[in-house]
């Protein structure tokens, strides 16, 4: 049997408040802190900070 994947899907939501999000995989054992990336928000057409939220 195959092993169960330990990675968790998380949602990176734009701090600009536009509702744009990216979905990333994160291993909770090795990456204990929350993710935050500076990525492109296509609604505001700028690079903004994206912070981690759980996928509902």
UniProtKB/Swiss-Prot annotation:
Superkingdom of source: Bacteria
Keywords: Ribonucleoprotein, Ribosomal protein
GO molecular function, one term: structural constituent of ribosome
Membrane spanning stretches: none
InterPro entries documented for this protein: Ribosomal_bL33, Ribosomal_bL33_CS, Ribosomal_bL33_sf, Ribosomal_zn-bd
One biological process term in Gene Ontology: translation
PROSITE patterns: RIBOSOMAL_L33 (PS00582)
Entries under Pfam families matching the protein: Ribosomal_L33
Any Gene Ontology CC annotation: cytoplasm
Family: Belongs to the bacterial ribosomal protein bL33 family.
PANTHER family per the UniProt record, alphabetical: 54S RIBOSOMAL PROTEIN L39, MITOCHONDRIAL (PTHR15238), LARGE RIBOSOMAL SUBUNIT PROTEIN BL33M (PTHR15238:SF1)
Name under which the protein is recorded: Large ribosomal subunit protein bL33
């Amino acid at each position: 049997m195959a092993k169960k994947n330990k990675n968790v899907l998380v949602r990176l939501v734009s701090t600009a408040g536009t509702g744009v999000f990216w979905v990333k995989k994160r291993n909770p054992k090795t990456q204990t802190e929350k993710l935050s990336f500076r990525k492109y928000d296509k609604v505001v057409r700028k690079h903004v900070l994206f912070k981690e939220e759980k996928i509902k």
